[in-house]
Amino acid sequence: TRAARRIGAPGLGADDRARYLAAIDGLAYGDNPGEGLVRGRRFLHPGLSIAFEVPDAFAIENTRNAVLGTTPEGSRRLLFDQVEASGDRSLEDVLRATWNDAIEAGSVENRIVGGRSVATALSRGKDWTFRLAVIRVGETTFRMIMAAKGSTDPDGAFRRWTESLSAIDPAEARTLRPLRLVVVTAGAGETVEAVAQRMVVPDKPVERFLVLNGLERGASLRGGQPYKVVVE
């Protein structure tokens, strides 16, 4: 961030730096619980009372309009969002109306997952293969899309993902809080990698730690100096 990079810039004295770090210590960071939270491979939305877990290797991000996910090499991606649909409209109709490409003939399946009605389908594009689902939870309809590069059908991972959609336990919902920025002191000889492992982030903790602290790759930490990390 701009503020993070400014900390290490010439002209910012030790007193100013100390005051800045004291001011941000404990500040909320990242997602607002009211808009959903990412915790590792889980997404939790107390307001909608839903949660799900993505398959191994996926890292997810909660954006304004959707939850997006990708694998490190980018060969698989996913999207979760909410769609407008009246309760009397069939899920198959909703699925077809919210997908612009062709749906493979005979691939639409209506089933019950976790007590909820679900319509799923397969769509094949030129470069990607898509698994689609529309799920009704109470009065709200959600869409889940998983894409795999090439002709590989991601059905196995897709089913595990859709089957993970569940209601949030009320007790867990009450405990959800935003992540926080905290200031920690590096020990003598402690490395960037060691301190970065304290970060509660969905992926790339080292890269995120470097950006947060205005450091370049390959930088060494100074024992006794304060650094910012993200924690629960």
Residue ranges of predicted features:
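Extracellular LysM carbohydrate-binding repeats and other cell-envelope/extracellular binding modules
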Residues: 204-232
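Secretory pathway targeting signatures of secreted, lumenal, and periplasmic proteins
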Residues: 51-98, 123
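Short, well-ordered beta-strand elements
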Residues: 79-82, 139-150
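Surface-exposed amphipathic alpha-helical segments
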Residues: 60, 144-181
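Stable alpha-helical elements in mature extracytoplasmic
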Residues: 3, 16, 20, 90-95, ...
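Primarily a LysM-type cell-wall glycan-binding module
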Residues: 172-203, 225
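Signature of long, low-cysteine stretches enriched in small and polar/charged residues
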Residues: 96-143
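C-terminal capping/extension segments of zinc metalloprotease domains
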Residues: 1-51, 59-68
